[in-house]
Amino acid sequence: MGLSLLAGCDNEKQQIFKEAEKDLEQGSYEYALDEFTTSVNNGVKPAVSYRGIGICQLRLGNYDDAITAFTSALGEEKVNKSMARDLYLYRATARLQAGYLDDAMADCQVLAQNYEMDADAWFLTGKVALEMDGYDEAASDFEQAYGEDSSYDRAIQIYETYLNKDMEADGTRYLEAVLSTEAK
């Protein structure tokens, strides 16, 4: 009897975790945050639960709390290489949003040294570099990002990043490039 009660308890804990994932996917960040926090307290997939907390906090604009959650997730034992890469991307994003530019760049450097860089990683690194007034590094990183993903959405992202720094001319060439390839 005691064993069946424990099994029921575990099922309930797993159900809370599954609800958290569903709520996160649907954009119900407050609900997901509560459920992921409960999952951490219940010991259910701590690394994934901390990641969920971090994403919720990031979406809610609570950047310091997001950074703490991503750092906690990185400190967990069961973090594979793919998840660690994902966590560094999220933490760098939260650090950038919070204005911790040196820390954001440190995460970007960890990504570049230890993980496969894709368009998202290059774009984020360029965005951090531009915020730090590293114009040449940003230009190089954006070139890499656009080389990996020359979509209209990526061109708009790069353009808007330059526009936000009053450097519209630097971003316009990405729009021109994507429009010229779509016109063919």
Please name every model-derived segment.
Residues 55-58, 72-114, 120:
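Alpha-helical adaptor scaffolds
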Residues 13-14, 47-48, 81-85, 119-120, ...:
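Helix-start (N-cap) detector for alpha-helical repeat units in TPR-like alpha-solenoids
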Residues 52, 86, 90, 124, ...:
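Canonical tetratricopeptide repeat
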Residues 21, 55, 93, 127, ...:
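Residue-level recognition of tetratricopeptide repeat
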Residues 149-184:
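Terminal, low-structured helical/coil segments at or just beyond the last alpha-helical repeat
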